[in-house]
Amino acid sequence: MGKDTIADIITSIRNADMNRKGTIQIGSTNITENIVQILLREGFIDNVRKHRERNKYFLVLTLRHRRNRKGPHRTILNLRRISRPGLRIYSNYQQIPRILGGMGIVILSTSRGIMTDREARLEGIGGEILCYIW
């Protein structure tokens, strides 16, 4: 775990998804809770619960896997960190990129909190582009 908590979340979810793990545990901060709520609302994860262990809070995520005859396969195809501590990427609401023609989502940090690209376009606000999920 480094200083970039958003990159840590993305890496943990990507690694658990590739290894077909059912649950993962990540550190709980305000930013991570907001991003996880967006992932839950958009249907990329099944369940979230807050776990306390020796005065530290963790989020336990249950990933969504579809079953087929050969076993479970992954649902989340790609996660990509865009804005990072060394290079911040900002966009106004007209220039927020559309991922796969609107099939994917862009998570933004705006003045009104962390939200998806659709919500930011509806409210007419831009912000820092945190990550793409498609």
From Swiss-Prot:
**Entries under InterPro entries matching the protein:** Ribosomal_uS8, Ribosomal_uS8_CS, Ribosomal_uS8_sf
Family listed: Belongs to the universal ribosomal protein uS8 family.
Q: What is the lineage of its organism?
A: Eukaryota, Viridiplantae, Streptophyta, Embryophyta, Tracheophyta
Role, per record: One of the primary rRNA binding proteins, it binds directly to 16S rRNA central domain where it helps coordinate assembly of the platform of the 30S subunit.
Query: Which Gene3D superfamilies does this one have?
Result: 3.30.1370.30, 3.30.1490.10
Q: Name one GO molecular function term.
A: structural constituent of ribosome
Localisation per UniProt entry? Plastid, Chloroplast
Q: How does it assemble?
A: Part of the 30S ribosomal subunit.
Instruction: State if Plastid is listed as a keyword.
Output: yes
For this record, the Gene Ontology CC terms, alphabetical, are: chloroplast; ribonucleoprotein complex; ribosome
* The protein's name: Small ribosomal subunit protein uS8c
Q: Which GO terms describe its biological process?
A: translation
Keywords in alphabetical order, please.
Chloroplast, Plastid, Ribonucleoprotein, Ribosomal protein, RNA-binding, rRNA-binding
The keyword NAD belongs to this UniProt entry's keyword annotation = no
User: What would be one Pfam family of this protein?
Assistant: Ribosomal_S8
